[in-house]
Each structure stands twice: as structure tokens, then as C-alpha cells.
């Protein structure tokens, strides 16, 4: 199988990521994070960014094979250390208010067999060192977009019955192009219409200002409090310079932050989570007074426990996102083993940091003010999927009255 018009569609995709995604403007600095396997796409993205007037495009290459060898064999003190030159680059990008474009294509099993303690130590070090970048991103001080490209090992994981590696890659590219509306006659207009539909749902929820949400489904009975003056966001965002951008491509979600002090009950995952090169399945999380008091998993439990119990702020939630079961990604019936796609197939929660923009005025608040407003602060932000066609969600008003939001996995407001 050879995907028809692949080069033409890859060019359209690159243009979408640079224009609709990070929305490059003349004089912008762009930081592109991408795998070495995706050099063809990287070249197109760099070309498009400069064509729109970018002042500089900095490419940050990654390689799963090299990273795996490092995690397996490097001395532990090196794994726990973030070199000064990487911190200096981060400071440079912050100074330039660089737009960040991250293209994900990693093998979901890249670090399978690496000791979870080594992966956890590295993630903790990176989280602490790059905290200023995380804060700038999560408060939309800069434009940022997360997208995907069809890596060979990832494609083989998603399509194990493909007749060849080439066919698996083609099948995955086809899904990426489809969900990112590349095949539409006018992709830019298609994205605007899609964003408008999501914005309409966000407006309804913002006007309601529910006190809490109640989730029920097989394996789930969870109540999440919502902060005062919380803000539901959808596809588009605005950076500190007043420029629009799309944080995720694809996206199907409407999201906010729960009050991290008010989570009660239990919730079960409905799709695998790919985290730190490991697949985690069958997650069940129990909350009391906002805090995770127990977490189990059928596969990858040790990795999950390391995430939750060894990272500051990881015992509470930072995001709750609503995605209907009727979304195109869900209806494809494909498990992508990639959070960007799987989270846009279904309702999900995030362990760790909340986005500052999830409360009114949050982008200008200090860390202490955000925490006082009910927004969790952490060095990590990890989404896991909880939705299904059996999930019901109610909005609870301050007087205790309830309004159905989801029934059988779909919007009813």
C-alpha cells in the first residue's frame, strides 16, 4: 500500500500545523521538537515557518533508540542531571517568547524493560529543570501545539495486522490526515467550523458555573469539585501577545481544571496509557479529599505508582476534559497508544498540574494564588482516559440540583 498523494497531503499538514497550529507571525522564534525519523516533515515545517516570516526555527531532534540506551546504561547521577546547556536553551526560548511545536511519533514501548526508577528519576529532573517552560506553556504565555507523525514502531503497534511496515505507516498517516482534516476541501475553514462547535459547548458550561461534576460508569463513581470562576476551554487559545493558536491537533475536547482539594470516589481507565515508553492498562484510582489514596493497574502498576507517589503534586488532578463517544477518533475504533489521539476519543482526566487559564485571571496569578484558587501545581501533567459509551456525567449546582451533561457517552446539553 502506498498512500495516494502522500507528499501533497504532508505539505498540507505541515502548512496547517504552522498556520492554524502555532500560527507563526513575522519575527517569531519557533522551537520544533521532532523525531529523527520524521526529517521529511521537519524540513517542510521549517520551510513553512520561514515562509511566514519566522526569525529563527530551532529544531530539537529526538531518537528513541539513543534515549533507550542512555536510560539502560548511563550512570544514575547523569540520568538525574539536566545539563546546563539544556537549561540555557530553555532560557533563550523563554526570552524570545518562542512558539513551541511538538510532533510526537514515539514507539509506545520504547522504554519497556527499563527500570521504572530510572525513568521516574529522569522525568522528575526534567520536570523540575523545565518548570519555567511548563508554566509559560500552561498559562498560554506562548503559542504551543502538540501534533503527531507516523513513526514506524508506533504504526506497527496500532496496526499489528498490516501486511508490511510500509502499510502500517500508511494506515497511521491516513488516520492522522483524516482526524486533522487534511482531506477537507478547505482544511482551514473546516478547523474554524469545528472550533466553533466546541466553543458553543464551552460557553454553555461557563454560563452554568457548576459546583461539581459527578461521573458514573462501570468501575467509576467519581465526584469532582470545580473552582470558583472556573473557565471551560476548547480548541483554540490566545497567547499573551493576543495571537490565536491551537494547542492540540487533533482536538475534540472541552476542558477545565477541577478543584484539586475536592475529589471523592473512584475512577477506572478505559484505554491504555503510553507513559515514559511503557504501556499502562487497567488503571483504577481512588480519591479522598482530593488526594489519590490508592492506585492500581493491570499492567505497568509500578510505573504508575512511581509517577503518582514520587512527583510533587502528582497525587491530585489538574484537568477534567469532556469528549463525546461520537467523536471521529472514538468512532474509528482504533486504540492509538498515544495520549494526543486517545484523549480525543473520550473523556479524560490529568494527574498533576492544572492549566493556569482554567480560572478567570489565572494567567496573571502567582503559583500560590493559583493553588489558593484550587488549581493543582505540579511538575507533571499526565492524561488518562476514562470515558466510554456507558458514561454519564451530571453537573451539580451549589444548591445540589443536577443537570445532565453526558448520557451514554454523549453530550445532552
Curated annotation (Swiss-Prot):
User: What is the pH dependence?
Assistant: Optimum pH is 7.5-8.5.
Please name the GO terms that the record assigns under molecular function.
aminopeptidase activity; metal ion binding; metallopeptidase activity
- Out of the domains of life, which is the source? Bacteria
InterPro entries according to UniProt = M29_Exopeptidase, M29_N-terminal, Peptidase_M29
What keywords does the record list, in alphabetical order?
Aminopeptidase, Hydrolase, Metal-binding, Metalloprotease, Protease
Q: Which GO terms describe its biological process?
A: proteolysis
Residues annotated for a divalent metal cation 2 binding in this entry: 319, 343, 381, 383
Uppermost EC category:
hydrolase
Q: Name the coiled-coil region(s).
A: none
> Which Gene3D superfamilies would you find in this protein's record?
Thermophilic metalloprotease (M29)
Describe its function: Exhibits a high specificity towards peptides possessing arginine or aromatic amino acids at the N-terminus. Could be involved both in bacterial growth by supplying amino acids.
The entry assigns this protein to a family as follows: Belongs to the peptidase M29 family.
Quaternary context: Monomer.
Protein name, entry field: Aminopeptidase PepS
Its gene name is pepS
Amino acid at each position: 500500500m502506498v498512500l495516494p498523494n502522500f507528499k501533497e497531503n504532508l505539505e498540507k499538514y505541515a502548512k496547517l500545523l504552522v498556520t492554524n497550529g502555532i500560527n507563526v507571525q513575522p519575527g517569531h522564534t519557533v522551537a520544533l521538537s521532532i523525531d529523527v525519523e520524521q526529517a521529511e516533515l521537519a524540513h517542510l515545517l521549517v520551510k513553512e515557518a520561514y515562509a511566514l516570516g519566522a526569525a529563527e526555527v530551532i529544531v530539537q531532534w529526538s531518537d528513541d533508540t539513543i534515549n533507550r540506551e542512555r536510560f539502560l546504561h548511563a550512570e544514575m547521577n547523569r540520568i538525574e542531571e539536566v545539563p546546563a546547556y539544556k537549561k540555557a536553551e530553555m532560557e533563550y526560548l523563554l526570552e524570545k517568547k518562542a512558539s513551541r511545536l511538538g510532533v510526537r511519533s514515539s514507539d509506545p514501548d520504547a522504554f519497556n524493560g527499563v527500570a521504572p526508577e530510572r525513568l521516574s528519576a529522569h522525568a522528575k529532573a526534567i520536570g523540575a529543570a523545565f518548570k519555567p517552560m511548563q508554566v509559560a506553556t500552561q498559562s498560554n504565555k506562548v503559542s504551543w501545539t502538540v501534533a503527531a507523525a507516523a513513526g514506524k514502531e508506533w504504526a506497527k503497534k496500532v496496526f499489528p495486522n498490516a501486511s508490511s511496515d510500509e502499510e502500517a505507516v500508511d494506515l497511521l498517516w491516513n488516520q492522522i490526515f483524516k482526524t486533522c482534516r487534511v482531506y477537507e476541501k478547505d482544511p482551514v475553514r473546516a478547523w474554524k467550523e469545528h472550533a466553533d462547535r466546541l466553543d458553543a459547548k464551552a460557553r454553555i458550561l461557563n454560563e452554568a458555573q457548576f459546583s461539581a461534576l459527578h461521573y458514573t460508569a462501570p468501575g467509576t463513581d467519581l465526584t469532582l469539585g470545580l473552582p470558583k470562576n472556573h473557565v471551560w476551554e476548547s480548541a483554540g487559545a490566545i497567547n499573551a501577545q493576543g495571537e490565536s493558536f491551537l494547542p492540540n491537533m487533533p482536538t475534540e475536547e472541552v476542558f477545565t481544571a477541577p478543584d484539586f482539594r475536592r475529589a471523592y470516589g473512584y475512577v477506572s481507565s478505559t484505554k491504555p496509557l503510553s507513559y515514559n515508553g511503557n504501556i499502562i492498562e487497567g488503571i483504577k484510582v481512588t480519591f479522598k479529599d482530593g488526594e489519590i489514596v490508592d492506585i492500581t493497574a493491570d499492567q505497568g502498576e509500578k510505573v504508575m505508582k512511581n509517577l503518582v507517589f514520587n512527583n510533587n503534586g502528582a497525587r491530585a488532578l489538574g484537568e477534567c476534559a469532556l469528549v463525546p463517544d461520537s467523536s471521529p477518533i472514538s468512532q474509528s475504533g482504533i486504540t492509538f497508544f498515544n495520549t494526543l489521539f486517545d484523549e480525543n476519543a473520550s473523556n479524560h482526566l490529568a494527574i498533576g498540574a492544572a492549566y493556569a487559564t482554567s480560572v478567570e485571571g489565572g494567567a496573571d496569578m502567582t503559583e500560590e494564588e493559583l493553588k489558593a484558587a484550587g488549581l493543582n501545581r505540579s511538575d507533571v501533567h499526565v492524561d488518562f482516559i476514562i470515558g466510554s459509551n456507558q458514561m454519564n456525567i451530571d453537573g451539580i449546582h451549589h444548591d445540589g440540583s443536577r443537570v445532565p451533561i453526558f448520557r451514554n457517552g454523549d453530550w445532552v446539553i
